[in-house]
């Protein structure tokens, strides 16, 4: 029996991807056994740590990866995949992984798995910039942002720039290169319109089960939603200037 293509769930850190993993599992997807409390696939952790920065730099007109690096990256990917769900268990089943940082590697993943489905979760960049979770900025900010973008800016401003660049890059690639297999979901829509948004996700996954009980049981808006509204107008204005193009594209700004 042939191996099916994976489902991958990605986002910038702290967007709320756990709920998407729960929805996918209701739809029958095996997202692996070695996961943490947030449903992150732990077998990809070291792979992401090793390869996101060199791959991102090569995509950003930086030094190209050498043939040896490219071959090693592919080797490491398939080793992580085999640990995550062994190949025999993937045959003829619905499977995939939820690992937010996979969003940085979408072109690579699409090249290795041409028919993969990708769910891109977004959360308002103003919320993200003001979050205490800045792990992705710490790990990958230097690879994503230029020197001028990193200098003389607050952590929140750098976080907003990272949010803008990573999400725009993924959106551009998904829409252009895999339109039938790319779904973008705003976390705010999940919270405000749980049934309608869960239905969209189920349709994308080809699931025929009733989305209503899943939406009721799995979606609870966190208290941190819209936290940016508690900040000063000056702070928010600076963030909105930094992220304007993405905030507008993703309908967070008019």
Could you describe each region identified by the protein language model?
Residues 16-29, 109-113, 133, 184-209:
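PAPS/PAP-binding and catalytic site of the sulfotransferase fold
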């Amino acid at each position: 029996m042939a191996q099916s293509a994976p489902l991958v769930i990605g986002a910038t850190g702290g967007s709320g991807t756990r709920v998407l993993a729960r929805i996918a599992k209701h739809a029958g997807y095996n997202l692996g056994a070695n996961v943490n409390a947030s449903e992150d696939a732990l077998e990809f952790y070291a792979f992401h740590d090793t390869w996101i920065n060199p791959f991102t730099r090569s995509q950003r007109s930086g030094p190209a990866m050498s043939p040896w690096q490219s071959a090693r990256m592919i080797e490491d990917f398939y080793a992580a995949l085999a640990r995550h769900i062994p190949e025999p268990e993937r045959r003829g089943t619905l499977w995939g992984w939820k690992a937010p940082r996979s969003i940085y590697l979408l072109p690579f993943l699409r090249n290795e798995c041409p028919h993969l489905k990708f769910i891109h979760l977004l959360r308002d960049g103003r919320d993200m910039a003001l979050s205490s979770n800045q792990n992705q900025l710490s790990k990958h900010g230097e690879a994503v942002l230029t020197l001028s973008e990193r200098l003389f800016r607050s952590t929140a401003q750098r976080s907003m720039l990272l949010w803008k660049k990573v999400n725009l890059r993924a959106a551009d690639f998904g829409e252009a290169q895999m339109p039938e297999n790319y779904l973008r979901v705003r976390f705010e829509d999940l919270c405000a319109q749980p049934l309608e948004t869960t239905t969209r996700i189920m349709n994308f996954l080809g699931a025929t089960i009733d989305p209503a009980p899943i939406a009721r049981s799995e979606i609870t808006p966190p208290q941190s939603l819209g936290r940016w509204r508690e900040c000063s107008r000056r702070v928010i204005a600076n963030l909105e200037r930094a992220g304007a193009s993405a905030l507008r594209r993703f309908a967070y700004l008019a």
